[in-house]
Amino acid sequence: MTRETLVAGEALIDFIPGERGALATVEAFSRQAGGAPANVAVGLARLNRTPWFCTTLATDAFGEHLATVLDREGIPDRFVNRAPDAQTALAFVSHGRDADREFTFYRQETADRQFDTSGVGDGVLESVDVVVVGGVTLTVEPARSETFDLVERALAAGCRVCFDPNVRPELWEVDPATTMRRMLSMTDVLKGSREDLGGDTLPTDPEELLDAGPDAVFLTAGDAGARLIADEGSPWGRGEWRHDGYRVDDVVDTTGAGDAFTAGVVAGLVDGAAPEELLGFANAVAAEMTTTPASSSSATSRTS
């Protein structure tokens, strides 16, 4: 039986600025499909490894746009739920001079808060190899409980769980420290960025992260590349590997680069790639992402 990949989490709309500067000074934005799990799902599809995607979309105009994008990318709608009484979450992006970004979220009464994983039955999970989840659905109930239920059932079915914390402090409505500790204890592969680590949610020491639960930790550092730190329980055994990344002279936007990296990691994990090969591939996918306007609805060549 062919083993599948399941990505689960939010899809939302990113508004990408047409110029650099503070949000209050930007005069024009472009609408783009986004949300870290949605970006990962689309990235995998563009790498010819189309996953299942479990999400909840509104039925407003933005929700219809997201559904259209997912359909265009060939992602099955079997686990795409609809919430007719909700709106689509919005994220406005602002860029500094170095192309880095900040997010301003509008997330009241939105569909992602109604995230529902009940449609993914245990029988489905028996055919799944890797389940990918993110941190945003952990920030609010009932989405938090739905995420944990899916992960618990996935582990019971023998799936590997890949987790990207995607820390957004302004979104938390439940205790972040307790939630993150529980999630780390259920994680096989963790992918984190410099921005995710530290504070009250995640330790900065890779060994502490491994002690918290994961067998493998991928730490990204933007254009400085990434590291993989793993213990004996990982597919690669115990060790540490590094890739220095790729120089990109024409960076347009870094939004979604981390999600592209995650897609590369999952693809390599499913393919059984060696650590050096996997890191090089994931860094290449992420680097290419920075050369186009961000999000799921950008140029399809981005992760090909």
Role assignments for model-derived ranges:
Residues 1-75:
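Glycine-rich phosphate/adenosyl-contacting loop at the front of the ribokinase-like
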Residues 130, 135-208, 212-216, 222-226, ...:
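Conserved beta-alpha-beta core of the PfkB/ribokinase-like small-molecule kinase fold
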Residues 11, 136, 260:
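Active-site metal-binding loops of divalent metal-dependent hydrolases
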Residues 3-6, 203-304:
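Conserved phosphate-binding/catalytic region of the ribokinase-like
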Residues 50-133:
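Conserved N-terminal subdomain of the carbohydrate kinase-like
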Residues 44, 193, 258:
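Short, conserved phosphate/pyrophosphate- and ester-handling motifs at nucleotide-, phospho-/glycolipid
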Residues 19-27, 105, 239-246:
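Short glycine/proline- and charge-enriched loop/turn segments
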